[in-house]
Amino acid sequence: MYHLLLRVMFRLPPERIHHLAFAAMRLVTRFSPLRQLVGRVLVVDDPVLRNTVFGLDFPAPLGLAAGFDKDATGVDAWGPLGFGFAEVGTVTAQAQPGNPAPRLFRLPADRALINRMGFNNHGAGNAANHLRQRRAGVPIGANIGKTKIVDAADAPADYTASAHLLGPLADFMVVNVSSPNTPGLRDLQAVESLRPLLRAVLDSVTVPVLVKIAPDLSDDDVDAVADLALELGLAGIVATNTTIRRDGLNTPDDEVTAIGAGGLSGPPVAERSLEVLRRLHARVGDRLVLISVGGIETVDQAWERILAGASLVQGYTGFIYGGPFWARRIHKGLARKVREAGYSSVADAVGAGAVR
């Protein structure tokens, strides 16, 4: 049924469909009786899925990745829709419109997306107002990025401005230095630039702080970020963001070229995201929390990430192509995998398949 609906929706511009679908999700979870009904249908409440990660209780390991709920307007929707947590944003200190449309593109042949949104959002103050009004529910992380007009030299102060507003209201913070759609942002992943930025954010909040990295980093740079995270006492690393690479796609080259710049998400990034996760786990073991995102569509893929060292996993493009029952399918499947493997909980499986 959803496959047929997807074909109809794909006749409309991607960003318009996003707004319509997101509005529908917020509507059906706004009122208590309907919210409870949706939750009974979509939530998998199974004790083997629970995990305590950086001191927070996660009812299930699959969360919504940043990029869908940019302004935290849907924070009360994600739990009833079956997710174990959600990451809102990316939020910047100042409101900004992002890049000109069209800026979101589908690659159905690859079940992928290309976006060059450019951190369009209404600013950290606006997101803080929404977070302040949220109901008790699943953990919510705030993903913060650099305001486009702010110079790189002033990035620590810019990130800190967002952290001051969102830190008291979110359950954890994610510092995004890996989007390809803000000029110069990925340069902040270099350790000499990243150290003062992360230190400034850490000094301004009391909640756990993680950093989100790109799949396009070299292996040496992945190691360097991991070492820095340990040095500074970060809670963890989110790996990975979208990729600027375009190799191995089923979509014709001329169509991809016509789309132009942007970050590619979905199955084409899965292999590299898994490689980065494995490298990080080999480097840091259980000293940092690893959240794996990038190309996860199936139960087997989510389970593979957990065995490779991910305490939590995330999806966005998988949700778009998988539909409203996607999170439920993943969680039902993971609960089955946990029991079949003889573990008492998903926490016991984290890193169990990693090469020692």
Swiss-Prot record:
Disulfide bonds: none annotated. FMN binds at A66, G67, F68, D69, K70, T90, N143, N176, K212, T240, G266, G295, Y316, T317. GO terms for cellular component: cytoplasm; plasma membrane. It is found in: Cell membrane. The active site is at S179 (nucleophile). It comes from the Bacteria. Its main location: membrane. The keyword Hydrolase does not apply. It is an enzyme of class 1 (oxidoreductase). This is Dihydroorotate dehydrogenase (quinone). Pfam families: DHO_dh. Keywords: Cell membrane, Flavoprotein, FMN, Membrane, Oxidoreductase, Pyrimidine biosynthesis. Substrate binds at K70, N115, R116, M117, G118, F119, N176, N181, N241, T242. PANTHER family: DIHYDROOROTATE DEHYDROGENASE (QUINONE), MITOCHONDRIAL (PTHR48109:SF4), DIHYDROOROTATE DEHYDROGENASE (QUINONE), MITOCHONDRIAL-RELATED (PTHR48109). It is a peripheral membrane protein. InterPro entries: Aldolase_TIM, DHO_dehydrogenase, Dihydroorotate_DH_2, Dihydroorotate_DH_cat, Dihydroorotate_DH_CS. Monomer. HAMAP family: DHO_dh_type2 (MF_00225). Binds 1 FMN per subunit. CDD domains: DHOD_2_like. It catalyses: (S)-dihydroorotate + a quinone = orotate + a quinol. Catalyzes the conversion of dihydroorotate to orotate with quinone as electron acceptor. Its cofactor is FMN. Pathway: Pyrimidine metabolism; UMP biosynthesis via de novo pathway; orotate from (S)-dihydroorotate (quinone route): step 1/1.
